[in-house]
Amino acid sequence: MPASAAPCAAPYGTPSPAAPEGAHTAAAGRGAPVSLPRLAQLRAAGEKITMLTAYDATFAALADAAGVECILVGDSLGMVCQGLPSTVGVQLDTMAYHSACVARGLHRVQGSAWLVADLPYGSYAESREQALRSACVLMQAGAQMVKLEGGGWTAPTVEFLVQRGVPVCAHLGLTPQSVHALGGYRVQGKTDAGARTLRQQARELQDAGAALLVLEMVPAALARDITDALPHCHTIGIGAGNGTAGQVLVLHDMLGMNLGKMPRFVHNFMQDAGSVHGAIAAYVQAVKQGRFPDDALHAW
């Protein structure tokens, strides 16, 4: 059932005044800057971490004002903004341009969100040194953390970057940059062997120093197990159920700005909100209160 269908609509309307203690409010984005220690504090307190994509100054400022802790300048911009068939064609200079736009948007409103930027396809696999050069481009554009996709083979690169002062978010499960090798956008880790591999890769990435780990299109039970096994690396789920330390969605998807079939793991928060800000605030509250995602509707 599409996430925007009627049975899913009622719980995710305009945020109510009765947010849980410690939850972000619509003005939370103006608070103290989010940092890695702050994200660790949220997890230790049992509060979910919220992340959304943004590709320009205006949407970044809106997400920050609505209380989103982490903004991801994702290479999904290739499909969302550039009309590419996948993320494979996204270039490093494009990622730097959009990272700078988002950073300026946050600076303009004295925002507090933590800014993560994707290392695009072909910008880090050749060598650790190539990865560092690429990461420097994004960090100098305003990113505070870089994200890279891949399993155990990326662990040495993660360690190399972290040792040189570059915070890293890893990414397992469905890795869109490998869509051709994976044979399409399919759930990963469904078999016993696949689940064992993902568990092992997650441990290797934590040991290498990854501070965050995106788990995409992974069975909910497996994502929960991985999360419980990683005390020092905070999992961010997308299509991975409610048991991760946080959630991320593509902004355009959760606003209903999708011309194709809505992914199973998405809910259209705009349909019950009166504004973009209201939709994002509703997403933040639904995640914080544990109402989104609903494993029965949005997970495998």
UniProtKB/Swiss-Prot annotation:
Sequence positions that bind Mg(2+): 75, 118, 149
Cofactor(s) needed: Mg(2+)
Keywords: Cytoplasm, Magnesium, Metal-binding, Pantothenate biosynthesis, Transferase
Catalytic reaction equation(s): 3-methyl-2-oxobutanoate + (6R)-5,10-methylene-5,6,7,8-tetrahydrofolate + H2O = 2-dehydropantoate + (6S)-5,6,7,8-tetrahydrofolate
Pathway: Cofactor biosynthesis; (R)-pantothenate biosynthesis; (R)-pantoate from 3-methyl-2-oxobutanoate: step 1/2
Cofactor note: Binds 1 Mg(2+) ion per subunit.
One GO molecular-function entry: magnesium ion binding
Binding site for 3-methyl-2-oxobutanoate: 75-76, 118, 147
Residue ranges of coiled coil: none
Enzyme Commission numbers on file: 2.1.2.11
Active-site residues, as the UniProt record annotates them: 216
Record keyword Transferase present: yes
GO cellular component annotations of the record: cytoplasm
Source species, domain of life: Bacteria
UniProt cross-references to CDD domains, sorted A to Z: KPHMT-like (cd06557)
Keyword Cytoplasm: yes
Subcellular compartments: Cytoplasm
GO biological process: pantothenate biosynthetic process
Summary of the function given for this chain in its UniProt record: Catalyzes the reversible reaction in which hydroxymethyl group from 5,10-methylenetetrahydrofolate is transferred onto alpha-ketoisovalerate to form ketopantoate.
Family: Belongs to the PanB family.
Subunit details: Homodecamer; pentamer of dimers.
Descriptive protein name: 3-methyl-2-oxobutanoate hydroxymethyltransferase
